């Protein structure tokens, strides 16, 4: 019988698609991230592995699999999988693009508004000490309308963020490896280099897909370029930002605030970040909506089914 191993719970809609094919489906149901030995045992006789974004699928795991034909990664990113080694072993690797676009863009913009208008701070105040009533100088934040947003990575998610920024009457700058003239026409965005973006943006959002060349792309030197009234928002990948440099920039008031959905050493969160009132933090929930997660479940199931039925998976990345 064809065997599918899943490295953690996924929405029922995908499981049902796999079971309807008559596949033997085994799913890790422990708490937290699956450990390597359990994963190696799980893939030993599996024909397919559905990995999660938090699942490290390295050479050791791949070598433990005797029959593996496909790794379907439940997430738009796939830096958790050694795709080059998988290719050498003739194993397809797929991801779930587009399913996360709207949900992650919505969270990105929610973070923009939350940090600019100090919403979590206000919520905490109301729940603890309370406040003395309305006053002209009390609890002021920043408006986003008329401000400049600088988007690092104008892919699917970055473009969706830009469309939301346009609705808020923001000026839009973007940077990335390539200029995208069609997007510029659609959104009214302007292509600039990273330094120009950092020097001019009031809100810098990171929406680039991670690769090793982007490690610590935002470091001490980059924070020094930013406006003292600017904000950094990261809903992409934690290691793009040097967290120690971010903490120092916030303490030194080189920037006004930050909002983070991802962290450099995730799931660990820098203790100093937790102490700063001008930082909004969320637990990597960029695509954590019922709609997005169900769609991702369908995508990994359908690509798994395609491969195991000798058809071409739709979203191969290697």
UniProtKB/Swiss-Prot annotation:
Its EC number is 1.1.1.-. The active site is at residues 237, 266, 284. It comes from the Bacteria. Keywords: NAD, Oxidoreductase. InterPro entries: D-2-hydroxyacid_DH (IPR050857), D-isomer_2_OHA_DH_cat_dom (IPR006139), D-isomer_DH_NAD-bd (IPR006140), NAD(P)-bd_dom_sf (IPR036291). Signal peptide: none annotated. Belongs to the D-isomer specific 2-hydroxyacid dehydrogenase family. This is Putative 2-hydroxyacid dehydrogenase SSP0606. It comes from Staphylococcus saprophyticus subsp. saprophyticus (strain ATCC 15305 / DSM 20229 / NCIMB 8711 / NCTC 7292 / S-41).
């Amino acid at each position: 019988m064809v065997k599918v191993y899943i490295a953690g719970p996924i929405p029922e809609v995908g499981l049902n698609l796999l079971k309807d094919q008559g596949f033997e489906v085994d799913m890790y149901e422990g708490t937290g991230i699956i450990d390597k030995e359990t994963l190696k045992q799980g893939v030993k006789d599996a024909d397919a592995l559905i990995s999660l974004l938090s699942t490290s699928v390295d050479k050791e795991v791949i070598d433990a699999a005797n029959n593996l034909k496909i790794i379907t990664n439940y997430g738009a990113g796939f830096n958790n999988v050694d795709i080059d080694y998988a290719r050498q072993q003739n194993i397809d690797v797929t991801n779930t693009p587009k399913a996360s676009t709207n949900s992650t863009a919505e969270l990105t913009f929610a973070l923009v508004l939350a940090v600019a208008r100090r919403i979590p701070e206000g919520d905490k105040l109301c729940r603890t000490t309370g406040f003395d009533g309305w006053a002209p100088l009390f609890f002021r934040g920043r408006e986003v309308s008329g401000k400049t947003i600088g988007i690092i990575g104008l892919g699917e998610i970055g473009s969706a963020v830009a469309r939301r920024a346009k609705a808020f009457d923001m000026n839009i700058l973007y940077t990335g490896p390539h200029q995208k003239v069609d997007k510029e026409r659609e959104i009214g965005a302007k292509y600039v280099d990273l330094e120009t973006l950092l020097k001019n943006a009031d809100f810098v959002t990171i929406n680039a897909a991670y690769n090793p060349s982007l490690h610590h792309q935002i470091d001490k030197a980059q924070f020094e370029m930013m406006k003292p009234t600017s904000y950094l928002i990261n809903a992409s990948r934690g290691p793009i930002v040097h967290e120690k440099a971010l903490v120092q920039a916030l303490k030194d008031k080189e920037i006004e605030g930050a909002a983070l959905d991802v962290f450099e050493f995730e799931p660990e969160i820098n203790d100093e970040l937790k102490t700063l009132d001008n930082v909004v933090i969320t637990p990597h929930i960029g695509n954590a909506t019922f709609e997005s997660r169900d769609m991702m479940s369908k995508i990994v199931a359908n690509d798994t089914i395609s491969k195991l039925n000798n058809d071409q998976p739709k979203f191969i990345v290697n």
